[in-house]
Amino acid sequence: MKLTSYWLETAPSFTASPIAALPGSVDAVVVGGGFSGLSAALRLRQLGASVVLLERERVVGEASGRNGGHVNNGLAGSFSFACKNMGVDKATSLYRVFNAAVDTVETVVRDNAIDCDFERCGKLKVGNLQAHRAALLSDYEKLQKEADPDVKFIDGQQIRSELESDLFNSGLIYPQSARMHMGRFGVGLAQSVMKAGGLIFENTPMTGIKSGKGGFEVSTPHGRIFAKNVLMATGTSRHGPSWFRQRIMPVGSFIVATEPMDATTLEQVMPGGRNVVTMQNIHNYFRATADNRLIFGGRASFSRSRTTTDIASGHMLLAAMRRTLPALPDVKIEYCWGGDVDMTVDRLPRAGQWNGVYYTMGYSGHGTQMSVYMGQRMAEAMSGMSGTNPLAGRSWPKIPFYGLASHFLPVVGAYYRAKDYVQNLEP
């Protein structure tokens, strides 16, 4: 079992700009080489701005290259709850932003000829309790009326047409969702930035930032750059201004990839061929790959990714995979990895300005499509275009007890596992 991301291991190599070419001044510095930063850098070049992207390690080496491979539309939580919490108009508007984000990814793939197995496969959100069924039905009715007439509610034997499993009693199909190879997309996006004239420097962290007349002085180990504008797209990074770190809770998400299987086997286990997300408090998500592997992930451990946690999580995920898909043959796990999700208190992303510095982050597990979309929107804002940020004006509270919060994550995880156990005892 390789303790590395399948996406990163099987992505093509990428050659960044030589360190000697670090310029003295540019229109924009983008900090962070994930999908947000790369998308912003490409859009900035399209709008005529000179741009340097600084990445502490390797492009798409963190969350962008360590996720489950889904490009899903729909909110992270319940649409019905969002309507009650923020009002129907705001919830509907946000839902449509997520839809537009999936469209944006597809457009970027097409316009830049990125070979990444992009496919509109749809998402299936499944429940195994009567409470789940009621919640899915409520969301279905609300979505049909307000935001997405394409969603479809299924139950009973209809489930078996999607999954060969007796575990689930209901599901909601989101046809607009997609999937792709994250590593190949990320490298293709980075190559597109370079081809457009942008500069990318890997292993080049931002070590300081000072505001000055007409812009910002950004420090790196390889020199300083003056930029008219700076975009922070750093997600769960432990570095950079503390204002951002105090508002992000890094939560580990862990994933395994099986060895390749016979295509017929996967089709029998997952005849619907969709991205699948479960509704348990400790939920799982899974999908097939173009080379007939099963990618299966979840919050197996409520701690940050590291070697010991990744190994333990891999064994837990294998057990969960067998419970969830009992028809799956005794297949081996070839890859196991973890990554950190940049959670906000309400699981909604944030984008705007702080002390003149632009930012976009906090995608809370729904980052693939939103990071690409928001990278473009923030690039447009940095270029002087108005009304481009759909997340403008949203307050961003600190994580309560930020310094201690990570120590309580295992307790939170134990609570939700116990809650799942009790709920599963229902008749």
Spans of features found by a protein language model:
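Flavin (FAD/FMN) cofactor-binding and adjacent substrate-gating region
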Residues: 1-10, 77-83, 107-188
